[in-house]
Regions:
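A glycine-rich, basic-preceded beta-loop-alpha segment at the flavin cofactor/substrate interface
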Residues: 61, 100-116, 121, 128-159, ...
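A short core secondary-structure module
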Residues: 52, 56-110
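Active-site lining segments that contact anionic ligands and/or coordinate catalytic metals
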Residues: 22-24, 40-42, 50, 72-74, ...
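Glycine- and acidic
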Residues: 1, 26-28, 56-62, 72, ...
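Core alpha/beta catalytic barrel or barrel-like domain that forms the active/cofactor pocket
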Residues: 1, 21-31, 92-93, 185-191
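Short Gly/Pro-enriched turn/cap motifs at secondary-structure boundaries
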Residues: 33-36, 66-68, 85, 121-127
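Internal maturation/activation junctions in enzymes
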Residues: 3-48
């Protein structure tokens, strides 16, 4: 989404760090009151004089929303500006880093991005799924105003592919482990 929709300045600052794995990224769509109907989103983006926005709201089910595996976590957050149209047509996409970087990519100060909690899950425990709170966190528009879903779906389509690949990999590993166990098991075999 950043590569296809962000400004050149955002691309130059964020993509090298994200591509190298030095920083990681998330998608922030779902809110406590809206899952599939993102038109009900309440997260707000208030414009600042310098071209940035203050992002305020809560997002849930954020994969890898908080961790210490990278230097920074860059959140792509769907939010609504004050005069945006109602529903899905009023949603914009914003880049909101956990730690604000300097223009040269070195890290500056923490942004107002907080992890409210980490979900207790049955599976995929190595991936923290978080509730994220944005309290006037500084963010930048990615793509066009009120066209956030178009920009977000670039990333979502890639994520869907990788989730499918992950499922195939896990099922193949489970099958191979079960097959190995069944072949090596002594109990129940006839002499």
């Amino acid at each position: 989404a950043i590569e296809k929709s962000a400004t050149d300045e955002l691309k130059q600052l964020y993509l090298p760090h994200l591509s190298s794995g030095k920083w990681t990224g998330t998608m922030n769509l779902t809110e406590p009151q809206c899952g599939t109907d993102l038109g009900l989103s309440k997260t707000m983006a208030t414009p600042n004089d310098d071209g940035s926005y203050n992002i305020t709201g809560t997002k849930i089910f954020i994969t890898c929303g908080e961790h210490d595996l990278s230097e920074n976590v860059v959140h792509l957050v769907l939010a609504r500006t004050p005069k945006a149209p109602e529903g899905i047509k009023g949603i914009s996409l914003f880049l909101v880093p956990k730690i604000l970087p300097h223009k040269d990519g070195t890290l500056d100060s923490p942004n107002n991005v907080k992890c409210g909690s980490i979900e207790k899950k049955m599976g995929i425990k190595a991936s923290p799924t978080c509730v994220m709170h944005y309290e006037e966190a500084k963010g930048w528009l990615v793509g066009d105003l009120n066209k956030g879903m178009k920009a977000m779906f670039i990333m979502m389509n890639g994520a869907r592919l990788f989730v499918g690949i992950q499922g195939i990999g896990l099922s193949e590993t489970a099958f191979q482990s079960s097959l190995h166990y069944a072949k090596e098991r002594v109990q129940g075999k006839l002499p």
